[in-house]
Regions:
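C-terminal catalytic/substrate-binding lobe primarily of soluble NAD(P)-dependent oxidoreductases
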Residues: 1-104
Length: 104
């Protein structure tokens, strides 16, 4: 019942202007067990819950439909990034998303 009060009703949500003005920026730092360090940056313009997610879903579908020969044949249950790898990353970059990894 708490979520019903917090979440928008079906058909409600941010205006087109708010969806366009939205964005997300993530920065992560990781260290391997051997001590190597990495920085990761992921960014996209557009509301993350509406516009950016729609781009990710659309590009994932196109990747599955059009890039299938470069994807694993069988591997069990995978995340989109594991299943589609660099093919999906390149599609998302072409759609305006940023994905960068650098060693520290």
């Amino acid at each position: 019942k708490v979520l019903d009060r917090l979440l928008p009703d079906p058909g409600e949500g941010p205006s087109a202007e708010k969806r366009e003005k939205g964005f997300f920026r993530m920065r992560n730092r990781a260290k391997t067990s051997s001590g190597r360090g990495f920085n990761c940056r992921v960014e996209a313009d557009g509301d993350p819950g509406y516009k950016a997610t729609a781009v990710m879903l659309g590009e994932s579908g196109l990747c599955l439909a059009l890039d299938g020969s470069g994807l694993p044949d069988a591997a069990g249950v995978l995340t989109p990034a594991t299943a589609m790898g660099e093919s999906l990353t390149e599609r998302l970059r072409a759609a305006g998303h940023t994905y960068e990894v650098s060693e520290v």
